């Protein structure tokens, strides 16, 4: 119940739903109250914020500092384990396997497989539990997609119980102890994930995937015209900012827990 409540409240505070709530409140004031000026202010703030957060220069300027914490892993250090954190998914056996990994999940898996190929004999670990309306776990879907891309099942470990990053860290500790491993997740999520894993006394090596903030050349109109693509980048900023606030409120500093 607490997990569901956390997800609902957290998602309502993300840019799109929050701005729609503000605009909706403004419309309600305009139509059903005498506070016309306040209603106009609410609508104007919501509209302007949505406009700005849907522009590439604004969205990526906000996202880039989070994503640039760790560089892409190109180190020669060899590891025995590569941990790929779960993300959005569904399971429809009629689809191409990779279509079942939604948004951030497929780039994470692709990077995990790249690193697995660079570390012969290593194990790929997929994490993530079962969604409320699904019978297949995030970890299992990741394993099935990896198999479809040529990774032998015996080289894969699935951790099917964790519901969030904190639980994923605890599950990885139980599975591999303090062995060094590559931690693969979205670049925006990696700073927060590293704190949870280090707090467990683990030895994660950061391997970011799914970088979104663009600083390479784009067409001028792509920078100037609002797009849901850029709004999604702003959404990542909101999501990770809320996650870090929650982490701070829980007292997760990144220092190992005292046994």
UniProtKB/Swiss-Prot annotation:
Membrane-spanning segments: 12-32, 39-59
Main localization, broad class: membrane
Example of a GO cellular component annotation carried by this entry: plasma membrane
Membrane topology: Multi-pass membrane protein
Phenotype seen when the gene is deleted: Deletion causes a severe growth defect at low temperature and an elevated frequency of cell lysis resulting from impaired metabolism of the essential lipid precursor required for peptidoglycan synthesis.
InterPro entries according to UniProt: Cell_Envelope_Assoc (IPR051599), DUF218 (IPR003848), Rossmann-like_a/b/a_fold (IPR014729)
Any GO BP: Gram-negative-bacterium-type cell wall biogenesis
Keywords assigned by UniProt, alphabetized: Cell inner membrane, Cell membrane, Cell wall biogenesis/degradation, Membrane, Transmembrane, Transmembrane helix
Subcellular location(s) per record: Cell inner membrane
RNA-binding listed as a keyword: no
NCBIfam families: PRK10494.1
Biological function: Plays a critical role in the metabolism of the essential lipid carrier used for cell wall synthesis.
Name by which UniProt lists this protein: Envelope biogenesis factor ElyC
Organism: Escherichia coli (strain K12)
């Amino acid at each position: 119940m607490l997990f569901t409540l956390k997800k609902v409240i957290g998602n309502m505070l993300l840019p799109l739903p929050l701005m729609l709530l503000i605009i909706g409140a403004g419309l309600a004031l305009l139509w059903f109250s005498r506070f016309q000026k306040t209603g106009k202010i609410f609508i104007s703030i919501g509209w302007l914020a949505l406009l700005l957060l849907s522009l590439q220069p604004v969205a990526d300027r906000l996202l880039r500092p989070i994503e640039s914490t760790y560089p892409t892993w190109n180190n020669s250090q060899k590891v025995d384990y590569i941990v790929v954190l779960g993300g959005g998914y569904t399971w429809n056996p009629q689809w191409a396997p990779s279509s079942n990994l939604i948004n951030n999940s497929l780039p994470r898996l692709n990077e995990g497989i790249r690193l697995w190929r660079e570390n012969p004999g290593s194990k790929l670990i997929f994490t993530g539990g079962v969604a409320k309306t699904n019978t297949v776990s995030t970890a299992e879907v990741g394993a099935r997609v990896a198999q479809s891309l040529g990774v032998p099942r015996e080289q894969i470990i699935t951790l099917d119980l964790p519901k969030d990053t904190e639980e994923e860290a605890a599950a990885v500790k139980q599975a591999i102890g303090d062995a060094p491993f590559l931690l693969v997740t979205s670049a925006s999520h990696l700073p927060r994930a590293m704190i949870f894993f280090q707090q467990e006394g683990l030895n994660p090596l950061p391997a970011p995937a799914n970088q979104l903030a663009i600083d390479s050349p784009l067409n001028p109109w792509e920078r100037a015209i609002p797009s849901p693509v850029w709004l999604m980048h702003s959404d990542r900023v909101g999501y990770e900012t809320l996650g870090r606030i929650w982490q701070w409120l829980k007292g997760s500093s990144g220092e190992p827990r005292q046994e």
